[in-house]
Regions:
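Zn2+-dependent peptidoglycan hydrolase active-site motif and core
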Residues: 45-90, 112-120
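Short peripheral tails and domain-boundary helices/loops at the edges of structured domains
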Residues: 77, 119-133
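Short hydrophobic beta/alpha edge segments that flank linear recognition/processing sites
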Residues: 34, 66-70, 95-109
């Protein structure tokens, strides 16, 4: 479904009506890619504070492009990248389901998608283990 229990919190799928087109792999791909047309809205998976928002070239070939990280507390955070544009900025508090950006293909990307990661205390968690997409 579009709602998942992660730790003590409830997270929602950030790009409703679209599923992932590339899954999490332990070696290099630390999230899922949600393929959707350019300009499709992306929503905050859970409430929190935006800790980083902007264009990231990244090291080691990450190249997240327009991306943001939301700190949800209790060691949990989510990352959304390759966005066409962002609607929030660092330091801003966001609510679950709030518009945070739009699907795009910025940075090291081969097509329109939202790269979505869930992290807990610096560890990457495979989103497909929590969402039935």
């Amino acid at each position: 479904g579009s709602v998942a229990q992660v730790g003590n919190g409830t997270f929602i799928w950030p790009v409703p009506q679209y599923t992932y087109c590339s899954r999490w792999y332990s070696s290099g791909h630390k999230g899922v890619d949600i393929c959707a047309p350019a300009g499709t809205p992306i929503y905050a998976s859970a409430s929190g504070v935006v800790t980083r928002a902007g264009y990231e070239r990244g090291g080691a070939g990450t190249g997240y492009g327009n991306s943001l990280i939301i700190d949800h507390g209790n060691g949990y955070s989510t990352l959304y990248s390759h966005c066409l544009s962002l609607t929030v900025s660092a330091g801003q508090a966001v609510s679950q389901g709030q518009l945070i950006g739009y699907v795009g293909s910025t940075g090291r990307s081969t097509g329109n998608h939202c790269h979505f990661e869930i992290r807990h205390n610096g560890r990457y968690l495979p989103p497909q283990n929590y969402f039935n997409k």
